[in-house]
């Protein structure tokens, strides 16, 4: 199976992944690809669309600062924006800078192995694709995988217990 090669691959198309794509592609002129597990961009804002989901950071701070143009053009409707407006903002930025041209949706990376002999990363996806890159950035966010702590004695505890 042939490997698709890029200078850099970014895993995740949320806030950080989109920012990395812009900086690496537009500023450093690297050949980049974002691999996103979901069917749309936005990261946590793509996955979490429940009623009332919103940002707990003020909108003026929850903004990209790499472009004064974006900062001036986009107007948030609320001090603490909801998930739909945040997704709309991310799509606006993505469209403005043609970021979607370098994003591959519905692509889950299942392994990333560093090839020391060739000084490169080899990535495999759930769709049986193989990618190769010199630089790998994991922009999967801190809430993409459940992390249940191993608490001594928890299995013997008979009461209710919760983890968030």
Give the positions of each predicted feature.
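A short, basic/flexible loop-to-alpha-helix module at the beginning of a structural domain
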Residues: 1-6, 164
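N-terminal Rossmann-like FAD-binding beta1-loop-alpha1 element of flavoenzymes
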Residues: 4-34
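A generic structural signal for alpha->beta connector loops
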Residues: 29-31, 100, 158-159
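Carboxylate/His-rich catalytic cores and anion/metal-binding grooves
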Residues: 34-43, 132-140
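Glycine-rich active-site loop/strand segments that organize a redox cofactor
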Residues: 39, 46-89
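Glycine-rich dinucleotide-binding loop and its adjacent helix/turn
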Residues: 69-76, 82, 86, 140-164
């Amino acid at each position: 199976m042939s490997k698709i090669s890029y200078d850099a691959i970014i895993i995740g198309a949320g806030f950080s992944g989109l920012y990395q794509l812009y900086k690496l592609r537009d500023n450093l002129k690297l050949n980049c690809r974002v691999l996103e597990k979901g069917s749309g961009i936005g990261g946590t804002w793509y996955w979490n669309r429940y009623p009332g989901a919103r940002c707990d950071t003020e909108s003026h701070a929850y903004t990209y600062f790499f472009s004064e143009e974006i900062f001036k053009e986009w107007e948030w409707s609320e001090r603490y924006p909801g998930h739909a407006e945040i997704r709309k903002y991310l799509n606006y930025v993505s469209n403005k800078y043609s970021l979607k041209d370098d994003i591959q949706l519905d692509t889950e990376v299942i392994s990333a192995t560093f090839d020391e002999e060739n000084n490169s990363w080899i990535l495999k996806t759930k769709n049986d694709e193989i990618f190769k890159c010199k630089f790998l950035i994991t922009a999967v966010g801190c809430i993409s995988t459940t992390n249940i702590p191993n608490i001594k004695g928890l299995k013997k505890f008979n009461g209710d217990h919760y983890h968030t």
